[in-house]
Design a protein with these regions (language model features):
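Disordered inhibitory propeptide/activation segment of secreted metzincin zinc metalloprotease zymogens
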Residues: 1-11
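Compositionally biased, low-complexity repeat tracts
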Residues: 4, 87-92, 138, 183, ...
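Juxtacatalytic substrate-recognition/specificity segment
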Residues: 11-136, 236-237
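Short, flexible segments with low predicted structural confidence
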Residues: 16, 87, 195-196, 212-213
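Short, amphipathic alpha-helical segments that act as regulatory/interfacial helices
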Residues: 41, 45, 209-216
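Acidic/His/Gly-enriched intrinsically disordered linker/tail segments
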Residues: 131-210, 217-266
């Protein structure tokens, strides 16, 4: 992807002029990190109308230890949190920057592009909300997965429907996740982190994707953008959810849980 620095870190500033970005349709045009970030940003801006900052700093780290150090140095994450994150995360999207762990080196192109799209979606959410850590964390993660999969679909590498089927199959193997969603508790970064550390990252992220997919199907991506943008005006999580989606978080949770149980035949 990029040549490594002596400290296992490469930092690349990218200027993203929305007017000059061209959305690719062929993944072969996205071989380098620079090409991938620019191409995916173009897809997000033109296809999903998601804002991307004019300048994004991309940090690529050669392994977990360098990634942990980068989280502290470049993202200003506390040492304790950086240690926890580096144990399971392979990427982080922060305000105006994307941090990527470049290991394992044999990561497939599809997974590399998914990761970049996921983290760039977090950068966009932060742009919309005017800051980090705003909005429901399960929804931020689920939306990031949805945009990433839709981006792969645009590039001919995957489909949303296949990801839905894969996620639903995963839920059937982790039926305890559908006993009680408790979205309020999983709405904070700390609550979401505890959830996926307890239940496993893959099934929890699959569930978050399915919940976000359900919400996007019923209310649309415009409502999702409006939800995150509402945090520039108000920090009220429940009120912002009600206003953007036209129903309370409790009512949505009950309806979504019933639909998921039916779809999973549980």
């Amino acid at each position: 992807m990029l040549a490594g620095g002596s400290d296992g870190r490469v930092a690349v500033p990218l200027w993203l002029d929305p007017l000059s970005l061209t959305a690719p349709t062929d993944a072969r045009a996205l071989r380098t990190t620079d090409e991938a970030v620019r191409g995916i940003a173009a897809i997000m801006a033109t296809r999903f109308r998601l804002p991307v900052p004019d300048r994004v700093m991309v940090h690529v780290y050669d392994g977990r230890r360098a990634f942990e150090q980068g989280l502290m140095r470049d993202a200003r994450v506390s040492p304790v949190q950086a240690s926890k994150l580096s144990n399971f995360a392979i990427g982080v999207g922060a305000r105006g920057q994307v941090l990527l762990n470049d290991r394992p080196a044999d990561r497939t192109q599809r997974e590399r592009l998914r990761l970049i799209a996921h983290e760039l979606t977090h950068v966009s959410q932060i742009e919309l909300a005017g800051g980090e850590g705003r909005g429901e964390q399960w929804l931020a993660e689920g939306m990031a997965e949805w945009v990433a999969f839709a981006t792969l679909e645009r590039l001919g590498l995957d489909t949303l429907e296949r990801r839905r089927q894969t996620a639903m199959a995963g839920l059937r193997s982790h039926a305890t996740l559908l006993q009680h969603l408790d979205l309020e508790a999983h709405g904070t970064p700390q609550g979401f982190a505890a959830w996926h550390l307890r239940e496993g990252s893959l099934p929890v992220y699959q569930l978050a994707f399915l919940i976000a997919d359900d919400l996007i199907e019923r209310r649309g991506l415009d409502a999702m953008r409006a939800y995150f943008a509402s945090f520039k005006r108000s920090s009220g999580r429940r009120g912002n959810f009600d206003a953007a989606f036209g129903l309370s978080l409790d009512d949505f949770e009950a309806a979504a849980l019933a639909r998921l149980k039916t779809a999973a035949a549980l």
